[in-house]
Amino acid sequence: MNYTRRDGTPQRPAASLASGMSRRAAIGGAVAVSLAAPAIADAESGRPIRIGEINSYTAVPAFTLPYRNGWQLAVAAINQAGGVLGRPLEVLSRDDAGKPQDALRLAGELVNGEKVDLLAGGFLSNIGLALSDFARQNGALYIAGEPLTDALVWEKGQPNCFRLRPSTYMQAAMLVDEAARLPARRWASVAPNYEYGQSAVRWFRQLLRARRPDVEFVAEQWPALGHIDAGAVAAALDAAAPEAIFNVTFGADLTNFVRQGGPRGLFERRAVVSMLTGEPEYLDPLGAEAPVGWIVTGYPAEQLDTPAHVAFRDAYRARFGQMPRMGSVVGYALMYAIAAGVTRAGRLDLAALIGGFAGAAFPTPFGPAQFRAIDHQSTLGTFVGRTALSGGKGVLADWRYVDGATVLPDAAAVRALRPGTP
């Protein structure tokens, strides 16, 4: 089935893991096929494969609670289909409260005390970097779910770390493809002042200038994460008289920014390009105040009707009684990625796991994805569209799916970015 825009225009076909199968088979049976590689070493009489999962459950519940639902759904389906290497998956989940020091302490407890076979998860980019460094120093494997900074796989990339979600570079490249077509020359940016925000702005500016040398950035605002003075930020941006704004705020910061910027006229007669804003976690809280016409990355959960996504959405709604969010997709895909990597490795020692995950292909609700061997970044993509109002709430309209593989740099560029890459 093709992806289609909200107006019905067909998009590029995407391969489906569910073609010709029942919905139940799409969730479980297809994985049994793809993960039924020889159950060789490490069978250990069915001892569970233990995954130490760490995330910011109390700090960012809008994303991480649906994320937890997603991985729980996936683990249940994988185990029902026979598990991995003939063994069930067992997830030991911990809350880092949005604090790197807590994440490191929990990682130590999971690896050294609980003897987990690998680490997974993470939301904030600084926590993802901390967990990657822990894995490097302690001979563990870390599969990052949500942390978006490119340093995780490039500047600070290392063999023990793989990342699922499309990164700041990838999402910036998707947005720049639209932004470069705008007539605007004078740009301003607003982003949370930590690793994710800094990385997103750096790449957006660099990629946009490469496409549009006439562009200049006339203002930038760096509010502290979770502590935006939205009125002051809106006033400062407006005073710089930009023709377009690049926004990287999310969550409560985004809500405050929209509510303060709108009445001040900040968004009138200005294009806004915004990372993540089309994801339900961040769009839904705005209700009828959701902006109209912003160019965003996001997730059209109610509109996406490919077989793989319908199977996932139906199973998710049946179990949890609500629509999935982007966090749900990330949690779900993360466990399938782990299952595929472990299956390909055939055993659980670190060297085998690294070799197994490098190049591992896995199913997701958006279609097939794969971990690149050269930088350990997955090819999972996301959606680009425009915000609109429908039924008194914000929705993603005129959307298209962008395969992550189409926006990733080639091997030569990765070697320049990632030290020690052969």
Describe every region a protein language model picked out.
Residues 1-21, 25, 29-35:
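N-terminal secretory signal peptides
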Residues 46, 69-91, 210-213:
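Signal peptide-proximal N-terminal region
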Residues 47, 361, 365-422:
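Solvent-exposed, acidic/polar segments of extracytosolic/periplasmic ligand-binding ectodomains
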Residues 52-72, 94-100, 123-124, 193-198, ...:
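Extracytoplasmic "Venus flytrap"
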Residues 63-69, 84-152, 164, 223-230, ...:
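Beta-alpha junction/loop-to-helix N-cap segments that form part of ligand/metal-binding clefts
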Residues 105, 150-151, 159-263, 300-311:
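Extracellular/periplasmic Venus flytrap/periplasmic-binding protein
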Residues 110, 114-123, 143-145, 188-191, ...:
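Periplasmic-binding protein-like
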Residues 260-332, 343-344, 348, 397-421:
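Extracellular/periplasmic periplasmic-binding protein-like sensory domains
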